[in-house]
Amino acid sequence: MGTSLGAACVLFMKKNLHYLVQRALTGFAAGVMVAAGVWSLLIPSMEQSAKMGRLRFVPAAVGFMLGVFFLLFLDRVIPHLHMNATEPEGAKSGFKRTTMLVLAVTLHNIPEGMAVGVVYAGWAADHHAISAAGALALSLGIAIQNFPEGAIISMPLRSEGMGKGKAFVYGVLSGVVEPVGAVLTILLAQFIIPVLPYLLSFAAGAMIYVVVEELIPEMSEKPHFNIGTIVFALGFVLMMILDVALG
């Protein structure tokens, strides 16, 4: 829903997306993702590990690194193109520039769907460390963060000459992987619970990878402005408040 609403901004767009607006949107998305990774995923992972009688840092550390390497692997094998970049990444292909731009966003939406699915799977299984309010906080935060993501993909496509309707559809499609990933994760809840601490930190590692590998470089491009950093902090604080207030 958040991605679709953000993508809908292109329908009212009359000119190119200003680079400061793009940096602000990117910074906000990055801030929400970092806060969600810490407050909604890593900390619950360590809390559950302690209640299971394990060293609380082991599942968090192992799962986090596995999440990072998983996204690194996908980055290497899936052809994609980051915003404002000229050279594509991943395996060589004959894909068009617009297709690879959408693939980049779709690829990096995978951990967000996983995060929501893992948390709801834990709640659905009546896991003691995950409340309905906590799962709602993460879902709401991801939905808010998806709004700028939808705008970030659809509006630049429009700036490159794509029709408004087509740019909107591409923006919506980039977020389809999230609900699909979340539903699949929930359906596998009975298999997930025994390794829930690892999966929570896995999703956190994948999300932090996206922030460091894609979002921070995009919000820090020349010419230098601090707008991305400031809005990053606002996004982080908003997600932190949501998690603490609802969780």
Task: Tell what function each PLM region has.
Residues M1-G247:
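Intrinsically disordered, metal-sensing/regulatory segments
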